[in-house]
């Protein structure tokens, strides 16, 4: 297969690198301006998708008041009425005509069929040039017909009845959203160019099924609103943004391999201690621990191993009710710039420096006194 060539930018506005398109399906310049239309589609998708992910601030973190809550959905066992994809629905959903191959032929590269009650998409397997597919809010339990879409770049199948994320490997797939399904495990996700994966609002209890050896391009992982109890299995070396809010996480494990992670969301979990962070997480700048069970500021001291940490959220933890909370956190983490969305003032920083220096002097005096006692 010919090497992929860059053609368009990330659809969700969250992947910094350009999407790669197989050379056999590159949009060529011509009278139909197909390349311009595809770029316009990408721009439109950027704008549409912005609201689905956390509202990002200066350092890539969500604005606290804007954080999307994953709704708790009551499952309804329903008898599905077969509703296959028809030629009529197919014609309505196809768009974005582009040149393919040597430029002598044309094919539609975008398909959208949302809220059509679809249970079968077998008809799609003939449309091998599709690159962008949205099948959200249907009744799908099987995505195997998509295995023939080897040019697929972007796939959204939110709000279906999927119980597994397993799919045949697609060589160019870079963005996939499987949010609000019934997925219980995440084995079988092996797309080599996958950069952005959303699995929010499912029933996933463990991340141990993630294939570290094959997801070496993954930059963004969204697992909010699942049933995770631990971070074990998330050892993905290229990961930059990890969203784990609204789970049941009580222990932090396997974080030592996240050397490129810059943003970590752990809001609304069950953490009482902060063991598990390590110095190898040298790029982590933003950490959201809101609404956990952290009762002692001594736990916050364990974050001193994070050399680049600049923004921390501890609201709605018992420790945030302690006297002089902001200053005490700054005493422990002098490089911190923001706490709970608010920048530290100069007077807070000066007071923290004074307290820190005084405590260091007291500790030194105690050590000298202890040494003196031993000598005597």
Please provide the spans of the model-predicted regions.
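The feature captures the LRR N-terminal capping module
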Residues: 2-188, 192-229, 237-245, 262-263, ...
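Short, function-defining helix-loop hinge/capping sites that tune catalysis or transport
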Residues: 146, 167, 209-210, 233, ...
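Structured C-terminal portions of repeat-based eukaryotic scaffold domains
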Residues: 237, 253-316, 325, 330
């Amino acid at each position: 297969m010919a090497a992929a060539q860059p053609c368009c930018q990330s659809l969700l506005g969250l992947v910094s690198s350009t999407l790669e398109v197989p050379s056999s399906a590159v949009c060529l310049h011509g009278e139909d301006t197909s390349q311009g239309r595809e770029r316009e589609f990408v721009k439109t998708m950027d704008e549409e998708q912005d609201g689905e992910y956390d509202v990002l601030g200066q350092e890539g973190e969500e604005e606290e008041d804007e954080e999307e809550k994953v709704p708790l959905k009551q499952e309804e066992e329903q008898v599905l009425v077969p509703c296959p994809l028809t030629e009529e629905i197919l014609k309505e959903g196809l768009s974005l005509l582009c040149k393919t191959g040597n430029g002598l032929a044309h094919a539609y590269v975008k398909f959208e069929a949302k809220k059509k009650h679809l249970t079968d998409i077998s008809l799609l397997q003939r449309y091998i040039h599709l690159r962008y597919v949205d099948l959200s809010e249907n009744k799908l339990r099987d995505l195997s017909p998509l295995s023939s879409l080897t040019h697929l770049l972007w796939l959204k199948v939110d709000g279906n009845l999927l119980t597994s994320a397993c799919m045949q490997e697609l060589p160019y797939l870079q963005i996939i959203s499987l949010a609000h399904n019934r997925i219980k495990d995440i084995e079988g996700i092996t797309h080599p160019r996958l950069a952005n994966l959303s699995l929010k609002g499912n029933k996933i209890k463990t991340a141990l099924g993630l294939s570290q050896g094959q997801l070496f391009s993954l930059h963004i992982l969204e697992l909010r609103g699942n049933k995770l109890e631990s971070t074990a299995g998330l050892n993905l070396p290229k990961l930059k943004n990890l969203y784990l809010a609204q789970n049941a996480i009580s222990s932090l494990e396997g974080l030592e391999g996240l050397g490129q992670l810059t943003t970590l969301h752990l809001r609304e979990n069950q953490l009482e201690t902060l063991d598990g962070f390590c110095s190898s997480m040298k790029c982590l700048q933003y950490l959201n621990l809101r609404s956990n069970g952290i009762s002692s500021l001594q736990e916050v001291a364990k974050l001193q191993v994070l050399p680049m940490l600049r923004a921390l959220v501890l609201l709605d933890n018992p420790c945030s009710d302690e006297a002089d909370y902001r200053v005490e956190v700054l005493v422990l983490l002098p490089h911190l710039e923001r706490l709970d969305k608010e920048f530290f003032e100069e007077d807070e920083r000066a007071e923290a420096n004074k307290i820190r220096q005084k405590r260091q002097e007291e500790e030194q005096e105690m050590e000298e006194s202890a040494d003196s006692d031993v000598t005597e």
